[in-house]
């Protein structure tokens, strides 16, 4: 069903959100076919504005609830803001699970207060809530079924875990410690060590452990590319760029308390041929013949 002209989203407004917050995502999205590209823009804008409702200027509980009201309006087919219209447009075309947004909201609620995660299981749950859910939203747009959705969740978790490993120092400034407390204790690391910027042997061992977990999730997630009908190169490029941050982090000796690992523009560009190769010849799941 075609949306009334008054309900058609202002795609330029949504693009401004993308370009302001993630030029990398925008460039990758250009590898989608036209309609799927618009769907990716709409979903990204909705998710990004939820994140901004927590961390952006004026962010907080009230802003988050206002964002959530917008999600609900989009699902009821009564959007108001441009991003809501974009999401409603996507919902007319793909079966994007409401539950994924519900779980994302739970992750954003965690971010509102001081963050302390007790276990690795809690960390992975959080990674699912704020990023694995994006995989669930994107899988239908990319033409995937349940297997693709499950793999997309793994990829989202891998990318969020990469974010967490990259941003330990920045997150501390917001009183957020996503590194599981049980793993900190097991490696002889105190939160005060993090605040003091002490990159100890125990801390490096902890980082290496979580880096290994992230790499395993990338392997599981990238094996889902073969289940997608469109957008393989776009998704592969995003994953390879994030995985490249892990390489930078390792090369720095896991010194992420005072600096932030990132890829330069030319390094991201070099990954484009690899993304097309992964799209053409998707990695096989571990254990497959």
Swiss-Prot record:
A Gene Ontology biological process in which this protein takes part is: carotenoid biosynthetic process
Spell out the molecular function terms from Gene Ontology: 15-cis-phytoene synthase activity; geranylgeranyl diphosphate synthase activity; metal ion binding; squalene synthase [NAD(P)H] activity
Q: Does the keyword Nucleotide-binding apply?
A: no
Transmembrane region positions? none
Q: Which InterPro entries does the UniProt entry name for this protein? A: Isoprenoid_synthase_dom_sf, Squ/phyt_synthse, Squalene/phytoene_synthase_CS, Trans_IPPS_bact-type, Trans_IPPS_HH
Which cofactor does this sequence's record say it needs?
Answer: ATP; Mn(2+); Mg(2+)
Co-factor binding details: ATP is required for the transferase activity but it does not seem to be hydrolyzed during the reaction.
Instruction: Identify which top EC class this enzyme belongs to.
Output: transferase
EC number(s) reported in the record: 2.5.1.-
The biological pathway it contributes to is:
Carotenoid biosynthesis; phytoene biosynthesis
Alphabetized UniProt keyword annotations: Carotenoid biosynthesis, Magnesium, Manganese, Metal-binding, Plasmid, Transferase
Homology family: Belongs to the phytoene/squalene synthase family.
Q: What job does this protein perform?
A: Involved in the biosynthesis of carotenoids. Catalyzes the condensation of two molecules of geranylgeranyl diphosphate (GGPP) to give prephytoene diphosphate (PPPP) and the subsequent rearrangement of the cyclopropylcarbinyl intermediate to yield phytoene.
What's the protein called, per UniProt?
Phytoene synthase
Which organism encodes this protein? Thermus thermophilus (strain ATCC BAA-163 / DSM 7039 / HB27)
This protein's encoding gene:
crtB
């Amino acid at each position: 069903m075609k949306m009334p002209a008054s309900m058609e989203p202002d795609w330029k407004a949504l693009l401004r959100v993308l370009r302001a917050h993630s030029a990398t995502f925008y460039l990758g999205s250009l590898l989608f076919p036209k309609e799927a590209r618009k769907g990716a823009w709409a979903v990204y804008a909705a998710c990004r504005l939820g994140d901004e409702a927590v961390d952006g200027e004026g962010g907080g509980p009230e802003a988050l609830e206002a964002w959530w009201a917008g999600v609900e309006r989009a699902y009821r087919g009564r959007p108001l803001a441009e991003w809501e219209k974009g999401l409603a447009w996507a919902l007319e075309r793909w079966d994007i699970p409401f539950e994924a947004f519900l779980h994302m909201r739970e992750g954003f609620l965690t971010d509102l207060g001081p963050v302390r995660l007790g276990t690795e299981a809690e960390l992975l749950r959080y990674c699912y809530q704020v990023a694995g859910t994006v995989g669930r939203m994107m899988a239908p747009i990319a033409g995937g079924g349940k297997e693709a959705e499950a793999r997309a969740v793994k990829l989202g978790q891998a990318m969020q875990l990469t974010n967490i490993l990259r941003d330990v120092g920045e997150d501390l400034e917001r009183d957020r410690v996503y590194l599981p407390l049980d793993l900190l204790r097991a490696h002889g690391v105190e939160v005060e060590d993090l605040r003091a910027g002490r990159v100890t042997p125990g801390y490096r061992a902890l980082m290496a452990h979580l880096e290994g977990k992230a790499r395993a999730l990338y392997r599981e997630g990238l094996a889902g590319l073969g289940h997608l009908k469109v957008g393989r190169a776009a998704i592969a490029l995003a994953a390879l760029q994030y995985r490249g941050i892990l390489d930078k982090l390792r090369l720095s000796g896991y010194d992420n308390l005072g600096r932030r690992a990132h890829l330069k523009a030319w390094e991201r560009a070099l990954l484009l041929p690899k993304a097309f190769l992964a799209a053409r010849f998707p990695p096989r799941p571990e254990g497959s013949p």
